[in-house]
Curated annotation (Swiss-Prot):
Belongs to the class-II aminoacyl-tRNA synthetase family. This is Threonine--tRNA ligase. It comes from the Bacteria. It comes from Corynebacterium jeikeium (strain K411). Homodimer. It is found in: Cytoplasm. It catalyses: tRNA(Thr) + L-threonine + ATP = L-threonyl-tRNA(Thr) + AMP + diphosphate + H(+). One of its GO terms (biological process) is threonyl-tRNA aminoacylation. Its cofactor is Zn(2+).
Length: 691
């Protein structure tokens, strides 16, 4: 009988007071090498539950912790942040005089910002990688140091202006910001890279940690690119150079990631959008504001139309609200208190002056709306509501505007102006569980309609330091959300303290064709806005009761979902979404009329069909429409005309010849009507031809 294998991710153990966590870990025989090497521990109880700690950490009292292996998301984050330190050490060694910005771990990698005399070149990155490998091979130790006071830290970083600014801001940075990596809550600390042979400090940096024990715990990394950046993402502040990299628990994991990224580059929706003439981002309009071209407009229309039909069938009422509103509305909703940085500056309207220029009526602030929910609340509150009307489901394709910093804008997936498939549901507490179940089932069903079918759920729960409403209602609603999520049968991943202040949330995460995860849909409970807007309904006993509000957006935004689908399908949309569903390609001009007649029959059934009558040779036409991702290409020559038939050509290069016209019409119309998401091919079409 073989020895059972310990799964590091499942291991919890107690660390006695006065004992380093790493020593307690070693007594258990947990791995310190390979992809499952333990890189840090996580507290599991008390007020510090969820806090990551170095293996060198010595607790003052007995404490239970969980081992964090390298091959977990948290473990990779620690490896990447440690690798960012190695990068910064290498930069200051190779480019003396460089000033340090910040260097956090990010999704799948890390970055570090530097103030340097000249932008980094690809050759510079190659040189830095070599220096980093030497540092990693030397096995430098990461040692934590806590400062007694701010002045001590300020003196130590006197030559680092960006660090001294962070030190001055200690305790006042957004806990979710990248800067919090260095000066978040708790002690002001730094980490030194220590030579294991001499004990000398080779380099140090302001940082909260944690870090891997030594640089040898960074087995695989790569620098990926450099770009311009601004200090703290503010264009009015100093210009910097940012180097991006990635780090993994093994060379195999790094190679797998690099293969996926190479495929992702081919699928980049920004490149495909230009190649397929789907959308653009004109400089004259501004960064983050996409313009959809005719072909992209068709795809978007099909996406919206199918969603609209499904919503109507599911009992949603369509509403429409304006793009701009008075600032008082967002004051009432709390957006100006909690979300002002994400809104565009106000416009001052409705002011009046007399002939001498004296103000007779003060102007009011108007804002482009960042969210639709306040206006939907006004619709609910526009008249008295009865319990018989609940659940009330208000739905809108509502365009919103959010001031995203230029550095985070990314094509369609992170824009400044976008349209949400936004719904707000008002229900009683007794209806909540069934309504959440119905919403989640609807989300999964609709996403599957578009060809996404690999999901897991994430449950975001209360941040004990930032919430409204009673503990009781949070606990009850979180239990309901967890029960609904569990009933779905999908994997449920906890996100402790990840909820917004106004209620717990389930998010649907979808994996695409190359295994990347995208957050698609959110189902968010809200205990805040019904109170702020004094929303009420009349209960059966005649009393006035507060409804529970559910926010939900299935696509996130139309634009983002468009970009995700474009990359998922590598530009080859399913036939029902494709802007050009059928293109006829005559072998010679004499067959144009025959194909035009057949295309007319297809168009009569609502199919987007056309004939390529250009002067290009047939093979060039085939190449053009293959590049254009047309799912059905119909070739016609003399034999086809004689047999009253057409020949199919598919994107994979296969063909089915001599298909009778009636069969071809039936096959194409059924394929599109069924909204099949697979690409047609000879293997799939041949069996559909009647013998």
């Amino acid at each position: 009988m073989s020895t059972p294998e310990i799964t590091p991710a499942a291991v919890t153990f107690r660390v006695p007071a006065g004992t380093p966590a790493g020593a307690a870990m070693r007594e258990l025989g947990l791995p310190n090498k390979g992809p499952e090497a333990i890189v840090c521990v996580k507290e599991t109880e008390g007020e510090s539950a969820g806090q990551l700690r170095d293996l060198s950490w010595v607790p003052q009292q007995d404490v239970e912790v969980a081992a964090v292996p390298a091959n977990t998301d948290e473990g990779r984050g620690v490896i990447r942040h440690s690798c960012a330190h190695v990068l910064a050490q290498a930069v200051q060694k190779e480019f003396p005089g460089t000033k340090l910005g910040i260097g956090p771990a990010i999704d799948n990698g890390f970055y570090y910002d530097f103030q340097v005399a000249e932008p980094f070149t690809p050759e510079d990155l190659n040189k830095l990688e070599k220096t980093m490998k030497k540092i990693i091979k030397s096995g430098q130790k990461f040692e934590r140091k806590a400062y007694d006071d701010v002045e001590q830290a300020r003196a130590e970083y006197a030559d680092e202006p960006f660090k001294t600014e962070l030190i001055a801001d200690k305790g006042n940075v957004d806990p979710d910001s990248d800067e919090a990596t260095e000066v978040g809550a708790g002690e002001l600390t730094a980490y030194s890279n220590v030579n294991p042979r001499t004990g000398e400090v080779e380099w140090y940096d302001l940082c909260r940690g944690p870090h891997v024990p030594t640089t040898r715990y960074i087995p695989a990394f790569a620098l990926t690119r450099s770009s311009a950046a601004y200090w703290r993402g503010d264009q009015s502040k100093a210009g910097l150079q940012r180097i991006y990299g990635t780090a993994w628990e093994s060379k195999e994991a790094l190679a797998e990631y690099q293969t996926m990224m190479a495929e992702a580059e081919k699928r980049d929706h920004r490149r495909l959008g230009q190649e397929l003439d789907l959308f653009s981002f004109p400089d004259e309009i501004g960064s983050g504001f996409p313009v959809f071209h005719p072909d992209g407009g068709i795809v978007r229309l099909e996406m919206e139309e199918h969603s609209r039909k499904r919503h109507i069938a599911s009992g949603y009422s369509f509403v429409n609200t304006p793009h701009v509103t008075k600032g008082d509305l967002f004051q009432k909703s709390g957006h100006l208190d909690f979300y002002a940085d994400g809104m565009f500056p106000p416009m001052q309207l409705d002011g009046e002056t007399d002939d001498e220029g004296n103000v007779t009526k003060p102007a009011q602030d108007y804002y482009a709306k960042p969210m639709n929910c306040p206006m939907h609340n006004l619709i609910f509150a526009s008249r008295g509501r009865s319990y018989r009307e609940l659940p009330l489901r208000l739905f809108e394709f509502g365009t919103v505007y959010r001031y995203e910093k230029s550095g985070v804008i990314h094509g369609l997936t992170r824009a400044r102006g976008f349209t949400q498939d936004d719904a707000h549901i008002y229900c009683t507490e007794d209806q909540l569980e069934q309504e959440l179940t119905t919403v989640l089932e609807f989300i999964i069903s609709l996403l599957r309609d578009y060809g996404l079918d690999d999901f897991y759920l994430e449950l975001s729960t209360k941040d004990p330091n930032k919430f409204v409403g009673s503990d009781e209602i949070w606990e009850r609603s979180t239990e309901i959300l967890e029960r609904v999520a569990t009933k779905s049968g999908l994997e449920l991943v906890p996100d402790p303290a990840g909820a917004a202040f106004y209620g717990p949330k389930i998010s649907v995460q979808a994996r695409d064709a190359i295994g990347r995860t995208w957050q698609m849909s959110t189902v968010q409970l809200d205990f805040n806005l019904p109170e702020r807007f004094n929303l009420e309904y009349t209960a059966p006993d005649g009393s006035k009761q507060r409804p529970i509000m559910i926010h939900r957006a299935l696509f996130g935004s139309i634009e983002r979902f468009f970009g995700v689908l474009l990359e998922h399908y590598a530009g080859a949309f399913p036939a029902w979404l494709a802007p050009h569903q059928v293109v006829g390609i005559p072998v010679a001009d004499e067959f144009n009329e025959y194909l035009e007649n057949f295309a007319a029959d297809l168009r009569a059934q609502g199919i987007r069909a056309e004939v390529d009558t250009s002067d290009d040779r047939m093979q060039k036409k085939i190449r053009n429409h293959t590049t254009g991702k047309v799912p059905f290409m119909l070739l016609v020559g003399g034999r086809d005309v004689e047999a009253n038939a057409v020949s199919f050509r598919f994107l994979d290069g296969t063909q089915v010849n001599g298909v009778p016209r009636e069969d071809a019409l039936r096959i194409i119309s059924n394929w599109i009507a069924e909204r099949r998401n697979d690409q047609p091919s000879s293997e799939l079409i041949q069996p559909l031809v009647e013998v």
